[in-house]
């Protein structure tokens, strides 16, 4: 059974190059809450602010709420953790030098009203966002060479952030610098020289958070095919290295 969402389709956020696939993160469909973010751009005839439309009865009735007068949005993320508490992230004002601004909103009344709580930890382009609950969330940015990590964590809903540090491990003896002599100890690659680009964390129904640390686009260790898998069972307070494994970065699939 399908339900009609009372939104002009031109105001929805689509994946790049698509006219039918909604942008990942811009909508939520569960048994208890259905929500779509739209607007934040110039429509064909008028400005449409960043707006959330949601239903608590599987599409029978809909409520809309305008969040912000932003008209150059590029990224959306919406999630609800129970019937009352939810979060929205809006990325906007992207520049040619691959910078972007962010606003983080929270609701405690099911989506009726929203409060701006923060602007994110950095202005890089987002790879993705994942919240565990109304307090704990992760911002993962596209990696650029020279970055000291691309994964950040908040414990207060988005007011403040800290960089996620994953425990280093030992590499085997084949991990040598491509420009250095294999006889010089200082020329051996270290763990964080190889595994440096985090993918967006995931969380399972038991609350276990998983992060894959990849080699980025220029990886050469194990032909660039392996990633390091880490997990946390305490909402990101501590992390345990699981193993190295082959992974496809684009879809987080592993072998």
Q: Model regions: which residues?
A:
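Long, acidic/polar, low-complexity amphipathic helices and coiled-coil-like
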Residues: 1-45
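Short coil/turn segments at the loop-to-beta-strand junctions that recur within blades
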Residues: 8-11, 68-74, 120-125, 168-172, ...
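Entry beta-strands of beta-propeller and related beta-repeat scaffolds
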Residues: 33-37, 84-88, 135-138, 206-211
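Conserved blade-ending motifs and adjacent loop-strand segments that build the rim/top face
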Residues: 167-177, 184-193
